């Protein structure tokens, strides 16, 4: 079952997003293994990212092997604080 992850960064900016995504995605046009979609944009008080993964396990693999280690090392110009996170089992996904 597909698995969704929403990260909200209060006070986050487009510039911080660009620096962070460059550090954790394989390239500007490629998603990490197991990720189906990625959308991001400004929200009322910061920056919000929503990703859908093939399974909860593919999310956890990306989180544990790539995302968290790189964020803990510090990403130059990236988000200064960890995100507020919510997750969900995807009931329906449409193109």
What are these model-predicted stretches?
Residues 1-50, 54-69, 77-95:
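Short S/T/G/P-rich N-terminal loop/turn motif that feeds into the first structured element of a domain
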């Amino acid at each position: 079952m597909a698995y969704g992850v929403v990260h909200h960064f209060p006070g986050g900016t487009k510039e911080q997003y660009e620096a962070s995504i460059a550090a954790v995605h394989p390239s500007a046009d490629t998603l990490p293994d197991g990720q189906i979609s990625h959308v991001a944009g400004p929200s009322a008080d910061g920056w919000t990212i929503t990703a859908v993964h093939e399974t909860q396990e593919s999310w956890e693999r990306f989180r544990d092997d790539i995302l968290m280690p790189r964020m803990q090392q510090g990403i130059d110009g990236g988000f200064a604080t960890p995100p507020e996170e919510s997750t969900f089992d995807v009931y329906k996904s449409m193109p």
